[in-house]
UniProtKB/Swiss-Prot annotation:
This is Putative membrane protein insertion efficiency factor. Pfam families: YidD (PF01809). InterPro entries: Membr_insert_effic_factor_YidD. It is a peripheral membrane protein. Keywords: Cell inner membrane, Cell membrane, Membrane. It comes from Saccharophagus degradans (strain 2-40 / ATCC 43961 / DSM 17024). GO terms for cellular component: plasma membrane. The keyword Lipoprotein does not apply. NCBIfam families: membrane protein insertion efficiency factor YidD (TIGR00278). HAMAP family: UPF0161_YidD. It comes from the Bacteria.
Length: 91
């Protein structure tokens, strides 16, 4: 198979399918977004929001490091932290 075909297949593959442990974690984020977050209202002090950050961290870094990054971010999301722009670190 040519190199160009392999590259295009890699680019189009869904990153969550590569690691099945991400699926239940991403499902929990969706439950939070659609069931809990609307009841609480907009409270996140960060950009991207904590749920978006957690989703991106899981996809980019996998379930273990992604969870640690998400928990670290959630520990900063309180009234005594300034918040601001805090993107997911690159691999």
């Amino acid at each position: 198979m040519e190199a160009c075909c392999k590259k295009s297949r890699k680019a189009n593959s869904d990153p969550t399918r590569k690691n099945w442990l991400n699926l239940p974690l991403l499902a929990l984020i969706k439950v939070y977004r659609y069931a809990i977050s609307p009841l609480l209202g907009p409270r996140c002090r960060f950009e991207p929001t904590c749920s978006s950050y957690a989703e991106q961290a899981l996809i980019e870094h996998g379930p273990f490091k992604g969870t640690m990054l998400a928990l670290s971010r959630l520990s900063k999301c309180h009234p005594w932290h300034a918040g601001g722009y805090d993107p997911v670190p690159k691999k």
